[in-house]
Amino acid sequence: MQRKTGIDHTQRRKAGNIGEDAVCGFLARHGYEIIKRNFTVRGGEIDIIAEKADIIAFVEVKTREHGSLTSAEEAVDPVKQRHIVQTAQAFCKGILEPVCCRFDVAAVELENGRVKKLRYYVNAFDASMK
């Protein structure tokens, strides 16, 4: 099945992997430890879970080809945010001691299959479910 972009699932997954790899590298260079990639529970997935200085960052990665009609940032709408928060809550149930959490968004722009630009938004949204 193809979306309106005309890009098939395999191509989207490949682009997504390139974006996630780039963000993991970015996080590692900034002192984060990658705890988990593609954490999935019923109803949701978190692309990257990383930790630094006792803060767990739940990172949503959106990858787009250069010149796409919609930005990667626009794709993380309130519905997507709610799914991410619920998935993060499921992840945190397995942690015995309280932790500080935040929700970050990484927007990766590709050109010819290579990372052209990476924008990282710390604390891009919160768990308040407005």
Predicted segments, located by residue:
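Conserved catalytic cores of phosphodiester-cleaving nucleases, focusing on short active-site segments
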Residues: L27, I48-G67, I84
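Conserved protein-kinase catalytic-loop segment immediately C-terminal to the catalytic Asp
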Residues: D47-A50, A107-E109
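Acidic-basic catalytic patches of nuclease active cores, encompassing PD-(D/E)XK
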Residues: M1-R37
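Mg2+/Mn2+-dependent nuclease catalytic core
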Residues: R64-T87, K93
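Domain-level recognition of nuclease-like catalytic cores that cleave nucleotide substrates
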Residues: G94-K130
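Short, glycine/acidic-enriched loop or turn micro-motifs at the edges of active sites
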Residues: F39-V41, T63
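Short acidic/glycine-enriched loop/turn segments that link adjacent beta-strands
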Residues: V41-G44, R114
